[in-house]
Structure formats: C-alpha cells, structure tokens
Curated annotation (Swiss-Prot):
The lineage of its organism: Bacteria, Bacillati, Bacillota, Bacilli, Bacillales. It comes from Bacillus cereus (strain ATCC 10987 / NRS 248). InterPro entries: AAA+_ATPase, ABC_transporter-like_ATP-bd, ABC_transporter-like_CS, ABC_transpr_CbiO/EcfA_su, ECF_ABC_transporter_ATP-bd, EcfA_1, P-loop_NTPase. This is Energy-coupling factor transporter ATP-binding protein EcfA1. The keyword Membrane applies. Belongs to the ABC transporter superfamily. Energy-coupling factor EcfA family. Its EC number is 7.-.-.-.
Amino acid sequence: MKKEKLRTENISFQYPGAATYALKDVSFSLYEGEWVSVIGQNGSGKSTLAKLLNGLFLPEAGTITVNDTMVLSEETVWDVRKQIGMVFQNPDNQFVGTTVQDDVVFGLENIGMPREQMVERLDQALRLVRMEDFLNDEPHSLSGGQKQRVAIAGVLALQPSILILDEATSMLDPQGRREVVETVRQLVNEKGITVLSITHDLEEAAQSDRVIILNKGEILEEGTPEQIFKSSHMLQEIGLDVPFSVKIAELLKRNEILLQNTHLTMESLVNELWRLHSKK
C-alpha cells in the first residue's frame, strides 16, 4: 500500500464577515506517487484549500497532517512549508533571479546550503523538468510553459514531499499547458512525486490519477477521471463541463457509433476511431 503523504480531516474555514463557509467538513488523503486534481467552479473553495494546505490560513475546525506525523498549526507552519512546495498561476510573478540558474538556487541560498550541494540540486532539478539546456537564459527569453517548468524546478530543488500546482497552467497557451502537464506526469511516474493540482482546466484534470470535485466548499464527488467524467450531467449542473473528447464520444454514441473505452484525450479517441475504421 502506498504511503500517505497528506491527510485533511473535516477541515472547515470561513472568511471574516462571510455568510457561508469557504470550506466545510473537507476530508481526503494524498498518497506517494499520486497526482490528484481538484476541480470546481469559481467560489467552490479551490483556492482556499490551497492556502490552507500551505499554512497561509489555518482551518477553524479539523486537521491537516503531513507525512502522517506533522499536524499543521501556528507552531509547525514553517516545517509544513518545507514539505509542501507551491507553483502559482502567473509564471512572471515567480521569477526572482536574473537567469534560470539564479532563480532555481534562490531558495537554496536562503537556507544556507553549501555550494557543492546546491550545484547538485540545481542540476538534478533542471534535468527533472528538462530545462538543463537553459541554465544561463534570462526569464524574458522563455515561453510561458518553460517559465512554469523553471518554477517547478525551483520548488523541486528544495525537495518537498508534495507539489501543489495552484492554477499553474491557467495563463499558458495550449503548448505551454502540454509542456507542464507532460512534466508533471513524468515527475509522478518516474520519480514518485506526489502532486495536487488545483485547476479549472478539465483537460489537465483528465490526465491525473484522481479527481476531487469541490462545490460550495464541500466535496461533491471523488474518483478516477474515467468515473468523474462519465457523469457529464452532474458536472454541468454545477457549472462545469467535460473534456472535449468526452463530448465527441457522447455525440458519436447518439449516432449509434459505440466506443469500447472512455476517452479522456483526443489522441485516445482518434486512435479508437482509426481502429474502428480499419475494420470496415
């Protein structure tokens, strides 16, 4: 059984002056080497959840436990932040160095890491995100996807237990989103890194291992992408959609073209359509 990396138990949070809870009685776990996406419409509590997990806010009720032993509190918040790395929405707002190298080692310099170890961490982190050839490039010369990969490298250099992506692909073009999603999948599959993705991009969520739907601050549903995106009517009722490939598959079904599998990407859908066509 995979090791539990993070657990929330019945956490609730209400902003001062708000009439309702931003999060209410939310419980879930993250496991080693797992990529979980949290989706929901605006106001569902996604961003509040990210802030709670990183200790920017503390829950009014319930507990957040990291690595099965560390419970988030005012006393432990800095230790928790060492275990949870975050990548945010705007890549330009995350750069603090004049080059890729400077940016990735910034956090390591702040904790006084010896230079020899720092160079090793820098090389390792950039290789993980396939940006080792851009060591001396300036941020403005990079694409959006490349900037986010560097931001991920800066977090990975600190070797956290969990990587949280807070709408990390929302400001990227399609190519940039693909680059980041491919990088995340590689980190999970090859390095066993645990990832929580807060996102409104359903195509991105479809690539993860598990999906949690937040609605009005509560967990509405949880399951694999295949399980979640089969319930298109339920998603549409709460203001969400389904991946484009799922929409196309539903249209084909109405026209009596039955597919064997649930397709969460266009590539997968096209491959099955080609197989069906080749049998004719």
